[in-house]
Regions:
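Extended substrate-binding grooves/exosites of carbohydrate-active enzymes
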Residues: 1-192
């Protein structure tokens, strides 16, 4: 049996044989090293990165992307997954990583949108995910059976703060959105 790298090479060759005009791509997870033999097999590559959610800080994203691009300028690099969970009822005074708050999710995506737009060498970026979704094995943030990384709630009724950030970047439709409206009970003086 061929190993993982040989398998990917065989699959890539098969795609090229079937349709030589079709671009091929591969998604890697964060732990695939920069010197992996998996690099360069396909025409395009992407990484699933969650710096600032599962580990590290969200500022680690730009460091990693720039380091990869410096070491492999010949590879068309994309970001196939990135995101942070945001539960609309979680509204802390000071959002922080893995607090599952809507406000941290918005802060994370504000940073990501800025750094991704500043890197024209990225061939693609994919927010994970448009909607919260069911996932039987999950039990995080006090909500069993659900992944809360969506920009919109599971029932498709409530657009989270981060949704409006991307709407502002990606839509030509004029709109006004007031951030923080679900953060109504704030600590401190009422006139602050």
């Amino acid at each position: 049996k061929p190993g993982l790298v040989e398998n990917h090479k065989d699959l890539n060759a098969l795609v090229k044989e079937i349709d030589p005009t079709r671009l091929t791509t591969m998604a890697h997870v964060s732990m695939v090293p920069l010197d992996s033999r998996l690099h360069g097999i396909t025409d395009l590559e992407s990484y699933n990165h969650y710096f600032g959610w599962y580990g590290g800080k969200y500022t680690d994203n730009e460091k990693w992307l720039d380091n990869f691009h410096e070491k492999h300028p010949e590879i068309c690099l994309g970001l196939s997954e990135y995101g942070a969970e945001g539960i609309i009822t979680y509204q802390p005074d000071e959002p922080k990583c893995r607090d599952y708050s809507e406000s941290y999710q918005a802060e994370y995506h504000e940073h990501m949108a800025e750094i991704l737009m500043a890197r024209p060498y990225l061939w693609s970026t994919h927010v994970w995910n448009m909607f919260d979704f069911g996932c039987a094995a999950r039990n995080e943030g006090g909500t069993a059976g659900r992944n809360n990384k969506g920009l919109v709630t599971l029932d498709r009724k409530i657009k989270k703060e981060a949704f409006y950030l991307y709407k502002a970047y990606w839509s030509r439709e004029p709109f006004v959105h007031m951030c923080g409206r679900r953060y109504a009970q704030r600590p401190g003086d009422a006139d602050r």
